[in-house]
C-alpha cells in the first residue's frame, strides 16, 4: 500500500539499531537474537495494513501485550528464560522504533488505542518522504554504531 507506511527497510534499520541498544548491556553472544527480534518487532505493527492501519497494532497496549506474548510463547516452546527475555526485549525495541518512525509522519499513530482514537504525531513529512525515511535510516545506523563501539571498547 503505497503512501501508507515508511519503507520497510527504514523500519528494519531503525528497529535493529534500537534493539541493539539494549545489547550494549548484554554479552556479545546474544547479538543475533537482538537483530532477529528487532527485525520482527519492527515489521509486526504493519500486519494491520489491510484492517485499521495505524490503529489496531500501532499503540502502546499492543506493544506491551505482543512483546510479553512473544516471551511467553518462546518459553512455552521450550526456549530458555534468557533467550526468551532477550528476544522479547529486542522485539519490544523493534516494535517501539516502528511506532516512533510512524509518529513522524503526517498521519501519526493511535498510541492510546483502544482508550482513545486520537492520532499522535510529530509531523515532519509523509510516510513516503525522503526526510522521514532518511531519519529512520540515520538513527538506526547511529544506534548500530554506538553498539559496535561499545563492544570494541569492552
Located regions from the model:
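N-terminal membrane-targeting hydrophobic helices
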Residues: 1-154
Amino acid at each position: 500500500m503505497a503512501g501508507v507506511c515508511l519503507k520497510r527497510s527504514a523500519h528494519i534499520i531503525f528497529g535493529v539499531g534500537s534493539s541493539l541498544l539494549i545489547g550494549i548491556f548484554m554479552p556479545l553472544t546474544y547479538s543475533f537474537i537482538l537483530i532477529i527480534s528487532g527485525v520482527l518487532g519492527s515489521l509486526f505493527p504493519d500486519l494491520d495494513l489491510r484492517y485499521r492501519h495505524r490503529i489496531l497494532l500501532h499503540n502502546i497496549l499492543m506493544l506491551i501485550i505482543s512483546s510479553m506474548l512473544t516471551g511467553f510463547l518462546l518459553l512455552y516452546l521450550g526456549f530458555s528464560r534468557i533467550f526468551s527475555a532477550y528476544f522479547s526485549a529486542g522485539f519490544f525495541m523493534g516494535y517501539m522504533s516502528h511506532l516512533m518512525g510512524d509518529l513522524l509522519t503526517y498521519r501519526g499513530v493511535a498510541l492510546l488505542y483502544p482508550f482513545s482514537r486520537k492520532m499522535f504525531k510529530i509531523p515532519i513529512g509523509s510516510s513516503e518522504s525522503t526526510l522521514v525515511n532518511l531519519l529512520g535510516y540515520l538513527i538506526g545506523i547511529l544506534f548500530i554504531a554506538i553498539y559496535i563501539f561499545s563492544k570494541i571498547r569492552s
